[in-house]
Amino acid sequence: MKAVHFGAGNIGRGFVGLLLHNAGYEVVFADVAEGLIAQLADADSYAVHEVGESPAVQTVDNFRALNSNTQEAELITEIATADIVTTAVGPHILKFVAPVIARGIAARGAGMAPLQVMACENAINATDVLAREVASRPEAAGGALDGQAVFANTAVDRIVPNQEAGQGLDVTVESFYEWVIDRTAFAGSEPEIPGATFVDELAPYIERKLFTVNTGHASAAYFGFEAGLEKISDAMADQDVAEDVRAVLEETKQLLVAKHGFSNEAQEAYVQKILVRFTNPHLPDTVNRVGRAPLRKLSRHERFIGPAAELAERGVVPEALLGAISAALRFTDPADAEATELAGILASGSAADATARITGLDPDHPLFNAVSTLVEERQAELAATSA
């Protein structure tokens, strides 16, 4: 069995690639990072260090690596003969990997089983996005690729922090992970991945993860940044920050229970498990890493505005989520392009215009005015400091 995985970074090596390896697949990593691909091509193995309640070290071997910029022909051949294609490249990069995936599918031989494609990204229905990009390629014109590939949405969860210098290809990750896959796409022919969970309805699990893990993690980062703390574990050790994060997850729990029918007890247990993960002192995760890309995190259907908007539509004032949104508006990091862009948006135009640009909310949405007030407050702070 063979899997082609796009994205040979820490998540690719320490999560998706590891599980595919453990399932018995030969893994072909594809990436545009020339130095990383060269390291992988020269290596026989690398180690994944799992830290937390059940520490362990796993060795990954039986892999190869290709530069997707300079070795496209070889990559097409690998896709044409693979069983699985996965990605961990970031949702905005899917459109760039779609062309070679389409060419690889087109090159598959007659009678081969459909290629099983899964985008493992921190985004809702990312595989649908990839499928649309593939379908838009010339190779797919006239339904030419119909029946040659199946696309299944997934929900993935594993904290992989910035790595210590000098680790090489080795990766440090938390011991917890979750890879939930939509079973219905495979029509009874699910791939053999023992570490994954297959479900008939994925949407509740995607939103549970996004509105608990991602919302909570980013909340800890932004509240921690406001408190002048460096690491996520330090932030969660601060009583005020921990209480703020807990209040945010109480609101998202309320939404998830009402919307998807999770029992209050089951969701509370999930929240408690997530909070324990955030306190893991063995993960050197920083508020700057987790807080980066604030514009994406503040966008319409993401981890803050998404649940806050739905609660507002249900007549609930999401006070804790609004507090997290306020903290996110105050996040600064000169090394992060989105943080710089956010500051630029806040510095120009009215509060209403900035709110619309940042959040994508319509002015008549019940959440809009509350967020616009927060934006106006942040604009006043910035104006005062620049005066």
UniProtKB/Swiss-Prot annotation:
**Single GO biological process annotation from the record:** mannitol catabolic process
Write out the entry's keywords from A to Z. NAD, Oxidoreductase
This protein's GO cellular component annotations are: cytosol
Is the keyword Nuclease assigned to this protein? Answer: no
Answer yes or no on keyword Transcription: no
Leading EC class? oxidoreductase
- EC number(s) stated in the UniProt entry for this protein: 1.1.1.17
User: Can you name one GO molecular function term for this protein?
Assistant: mannitol-1-phosphate 5-dehydrogenase activity
Q: Which residues bind NAD(+)?
A: A3, V4, H5, F6, G7, A8, G9, N10, I11, G12, R13, G14
Q: Which Gene3D superfamilies match?
A: N-(1-d-carboxylethyl)-l-norvaline Dehydrogenase, domain 2, NAD(P)-binding Rossmann-like Domain
Q: Which reaction does it catalyse?
A: D-mannitol 1-phosphate + NAD(+) = beta-D-fructose 6-phosphate + NADH + H(+)
Which HAMAP family is this protein grouped with? Mannitol_dehydrog (MF_00196)
**PANTHER family referenced in this protein's UniProt entry, alphabetically:** ALTRONATE OXIDOREDUCTASE-RELATED, MANNITOL-1-PHOSPHATE 5-DEHYDROGENASE
Give the similarity note. Answer: Belongs to the mannitol dehydrogenase family.
Instruction: Spell out the protein name for this chain.
Output: Mannitol-1-phosphate 5-dehydrogenase
**Lineage, broadest ranks:** Bacteria, Bacillati, Actinomycetota, Actinomycetes, Micrococcales
